[in-house]
Amino acid sequence: MYPCFLMIGRAERFRISGSFRRAFPLYLEQIHSPSDIKAYMAEQRRALAEEMRAALIERTSHIGGHIGPNLGVIEATIALHTVFDAPTDKMIFDVSHQCYPHKMLTGRAAAYIDAAHYRDVSGFTSSEESVHDIFNIGHTSTSISLATGLAKARDLAGRRENVIAFIGDGSLSGGEALEGLNVAGEMQTNLIIVLNDNDWSIAENHGGMYAMLRRLRE
């Protein structure tokens, strides 16, 4: 078994249907855990994504937050929680500033749709909030190395759950991410890396790795 590396492309520009202040929500109020979306049809997932997008914009307009990174991972987060079985399967979001959709689907939707609860959750993953948040994260490039640790612990315990690291292309060049990739390749075990290749980072990406990613993209 080898580590699996998946790359998702840049999200299209977002369109919001109807008013941001329409009666919330059709689906979000009914979601208390990821199991609630497992049976959704494609159209239901699209409607859920629209609700999540509108809720993010509404909430952020009141209290601030990381709007761009979260708008860009809504569909990817719905897909992750549809395919995998959290919290048995472990998901680690790099930096974790893009965890708002994840929190919406893991029992914390009220913090995004009810103004009275907007400040009930932090802007990053927090193990104090939910068993779905494996680590308290706020730094870049840590997800892959954390995932290798979880995968090693799983293997030593004889378990079979999936371990998923979700990382952006900007974070991928960080030293700890490169060390994590090196260790993951040596482990030859079930470890899934999802690359959010959205072409956004604090500074422009340079180097041989990004030249390779451009070739894959093209």
What annotation goes with each model-predicted range?
Residues 20-104:
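N-terminal amphipathic, basic-rich helices that act as targeting or association modules
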Residues 66-187:
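Cofactor-binding active-site loop characterized by glycine-rich and histidine/acidic residues
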Residues 182-186, 193, 205, 211:
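A contiguous, mid-domain pocket- or channel-lining segment that forms the substrate-recognition surface
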Residues 92-94, 191-196:
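Short internal beta-strands
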Residues 198-218:
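Long, well-ordered, tryptophan-enriched scaffold segments
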Residues 10-15, 21-22:
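Basic polycationic patches enriched in arginine
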